[in-house]
Amino acid sequence: MKLVSFDAFRTLRLPETHYIKPELFFTHLADLREADWVLFPEYWQINPLVFGLKRRIFPSLASYLIGHNKIEMTRAFMAVAPEHVPWTLTAPNDPTSAERLWQQMALPFVAKIPKSSMGEGVFLIESQDDWQRYLKLTPSLYVQEWLPIDRDLRIIWIGDRVIGGFWRRQSDQGFHNNLSRGGRIDHSPLPEAAVALVHRLATALDINHAGFDIAMVDGYPFVLEFNRLFGNRGLGSLNNDIPGVILDYLERQSGCNDPDDDPLRPTPIWPVAI
């Protein structure tokens, strides 16, 4: 396989992978046209790669499109597993919509900025003052019911399977479980119900590289979001396994669509006489 990468860090240990700096995209079109897979392109490169050059990308197109915006992500989750999505309301950020959502939500509730990560755009709303501060920061309104939890799960999905994960305990400052916001790692076993939900969502939505955040409420899993580019903290020795898992997945996907690899219906060397 000919592999081209736009992320040197995430593909460092993948064999025979040609790294290209993202800003040099258009000076390496010949290399890209010859690639079997283009790995970890930046979001702005997706349209020219997929629709212009007809290249296969990893992570998948769905991983990029769904993972780019929390509102779109939640809508996708609600289409395939609505019973596992916290009660959510979205609206434009205008005075009428803001007042309507404020009246509909019971305190406390959670408000999010649609394009944010690492817990930076997630707020616990406990008062009108909290709500007004949030309204000044977000282009669109995205609110969810507050779940009574003091930890959540980060479950890692690569290719077509769960490779591991860990619990994230709430930070000493409260509310946020993100490691970047003071959350603590706990390597207690992953609940089977949470793993099964990740498998269901990722398979249904064609996601092949993500860290899913799952909340458990009385043993029942709720999906919060996923991150296409997840951090490596908390993964321990799994970090050593990831390159091999990616390579195995790419090889299997390539084989599935290569007629020369089909022993029952191989591509003829010469035209078949009729």
Mark where each language-model region is.
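Protein kinase-like catalytic core scaffold
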Residues: 109, 164, 210, 222-225
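Hydrophobic residue at the +6 position relative to the catalytic HRD Asp in the kinase catalytic loop
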Residues: 212-214
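Phosphate-binding site of ATP-dependent enzymes
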Residues: 120-205
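Short glycine/proline- and charge-enriched loop/turn segments
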Residues: 55-59, 175-183, 225-231
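Short glycine-/acidic-enriched loop or helix-start segments at secondary-structure transitions
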Residues: 15, 47-50, 69, 120-122, ...
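Conserved N-proximal alpha/beta basic substrate-recognition cap immediately N-terminal to
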Residues: 2-96
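Active-site nucleotide/adenylate-binding loops and adjacent lid/helix of ATP-dependent enzymes
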Residues: 13, 65-150, 191-195, 252
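C-terminal active-site "lid" helix and adjoining low-complexity regulatory extension at the edge
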Residues: 203, 216-274
